[in-house]
Amino acid sequence: VTGAGTTWVNTGELFVGSLGDATLDILAGATVSNGSAVIGRHSTSSVTVSGTDSSWTTGALLVGGDRSDTSSSVAGNGTLDILAGATVNGTSAVLGDSTDSEGTVNVDGTGSLWSLTNSVSVGGLGEGTVNITNGGKITSTGGLIGHEASGSGLVTISGDGSLWQNT
């Protein structure tokens, strides 16, 4: 999805890679909105949102795995990249939701923002990683790192102006 004025509106749930690998790129001022979303349910999949005025608005987000779906034993690996002044708005997020899954979110560059109205769990039953670099920012109402007993979480914040703000 590329270019200013280009819009994709999906009122339902969005799966980026359920059983097959998938990539979604939101670039150069494009916008996407949907209900809840999963990146890398039982696959290795990614979403990249890049460029000023590029945005993705989603409901609850799972990055890497989906513990509610037991139809496959394949662990999910998901990555969300928010780059170069792009914005992602959501309600809540779990990174590494299912056992043996991996979920990674990278927020890089001045003006790049991941804004959540609720909390983010970095490491559900699997492994979660967040990297906030070079002036990137996350805002949320709570954060859990290594939320579940079998999970693990790692958060790295580096570079001038980089911030994770919990209110």
PLM feature spans:
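Sequence/structural signature of small/polar-enriched beta-strand/turn repeats
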Residues: V1-T167
